[in-house]
Design a protein with these regions (language model features):
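N-terminal maturation segment of proteins
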Residues: 1-256
């Protein structure tokens, strides 16, 4: 009943802005956006300073993407690198077990984890992420299980997803931090630049963890494209919400 009331209430909300614009077009919007960026990323740099760094990183990422694409152009023409079938991961559980063995010696060791993989209910799959790690409780007992949700309707590369959500991504990250016995205040802070940044960073190890050369090459192609796309989205986010780009400017930038 509560969820139905929420759904009904959301349906009554009417947009007051007919233009597609960022928060910079609202009073105090630029300051608000700058505060959000610094708070969520955990940095002191201004949005424009961040955009400058992103732009430089974009150039490097594009050159890397171009080099990899040229190196594996035959694979790009014949294989679907956006939906790779990994022999090491016939199931999500098998993939996690495999990754657990591959991070040894690369990342600090942690205790053996209990974890359960759940399927996202059919009614929630539309719009749900490819997967989600459900953050464990602060006082989680040794015999309690970590939980990862998998969306079977999502098209994507399972191994990269398992790296991001499991080993050595979110599940590993949270378990490792709990093992350090940090003050409880650490668990109350909210800095997505730290938590999500770590998981995205670990995706760069996916190809390194693989044995099959074709899977490795396809993963490198997919990762290079993802890296460039992430930087593109981050750069345009700043331009739209800090510098007032409208739709036409965004479109022109993408067409360059």
């Amino acid at each position: 009943q509560a969820y139905q009331h929420l759904a009904d209430s959301l349906d009554t909300i009417q947009a007051t802005q007919s233009e597609t614009m960022g928060v910079s077009h609202y009073e105090g919007g630029k300051d608000y956006y700058a505060d959000i960026v610094q708070n969520q990323l955990g940095v002191k740099a201004t949005p424009d300073e961040i955009a400058k760094e992103i732009s430089q990183a974009q150039d490097d990422a594009f050159q890397n993407l171009l080099q990899i694409a040229l190196s594996y152009q035959d694979l790009i023409m014949t294989e679907d690198y956006t939906n790779i079938e990994y022999q090491e991961a016939p199931t999500p559980e098998a993939g996690l077990d495999y990754l657990k063995t591959k991070i040894t010696g690369v990342f600090p060791s942690i205790d053996n984890l209990n974890y359960q993989v759940y399927t996202v209910p059919e009614g929630n799959r539309d719009g749900f992420a490819p997967a989600a790690y459900l953050t464990g409780k602060i006082d989680m007992g040794e015999n309690e299980s970590e939980s990862i949700m998998i969306n079977p309707d999502s098209q994507g590369n399972l191994m990269s997803t398992l790296v991001h959500e499991g080993y050595p991504g979110h599940m590993y990250q949270n378990s490792y931090l709990r093992s350090l016995d940090y003050p409880a205040i650490m668990y109350l802070t909210d800095c997505i630049g730290y938590s999500e940044g770590w998981a995205i960073y670990t995706e760069s190890y996916t190809a390194e963890f693989l044995e099959d050369e074709t899977e490795k090459a396809l993963t490198m192609i997919a990762q290079a494209e993802t890296d460039y796309t992430n930087l593109l989205l981050a750069y345009t986010d700043v331009q739209i919400n800090q510098n007032g780009w409208i739709y036409d400017q965004f479109y022109d930038y993408l067409c360059e």
